[in-house]
Design a protein with these regions (language model features):
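Ferredoxin-reductase
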Residues: 2-89
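FNR/FR-type flavoprotein reductase catalytic core
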Residues: 77-134
């Protein structure tokens, strides 16, 4: 089994502001993650090596597609290119999701308060759409 990232098709892109956008892509059948985890996402680099950065998965673990939020950084090595993707383009998806903002790490209780700004909302979006949270 290769550790190389898989190529996934971009299904949709939505630009919310001049600094924030979201995109969805296909999800390999074998890709498993826990709601709240992050994964390496990227594009091919100019030197032939993948240019990857960590992105929290915003979709719940039961969804057939993967959803991500990103900020736009004009001179960012990855985001300067990623912000220009459109439906039909390809992105690279790492093989191993990781993270500690998962249901197993949350203490049981009546209320769960989540605070974030910008793209920090992504793992919360995953968790609040997971029926196991309730």
């Amino acid at each position: 089994m290769s550790n190389a990232p898989s190529e996934e098709e971009v299904l949709s892109v939505e630009h919310y502001t001049e600094r924030l956008f979201k995109f969805t892509c296909t999800r390999p059948q074998s890709f498993r993650f826990r709601s709240g985890e992050f994964i390496m996402i990227g594009l091919p680099g100019e030197n032939g090596k993948p240019l990857l950065r960590a992105y929290s998965v915003a979709s719940p673990n039961w969804d057939d597609t993967l959803e991500f939020y990103s900020i736009k950084v004009a001179d960012g090595p990855l985001t300067s290119k990623l912000q220009k993707i459109k439906a039909g383009d390809r992105v690279l998806l790492g093989k191993k999701p990781v993270g500690t903002l998962v249901l197993d790490a949350l203490k049981p209780g009546k209320r769960l308060y989540m605070f974030s700004t910008g793209t920090g909302f992504a793992p919360f979006a995953s968790l609040i759409r997971d029926p196991e949270t309730y």
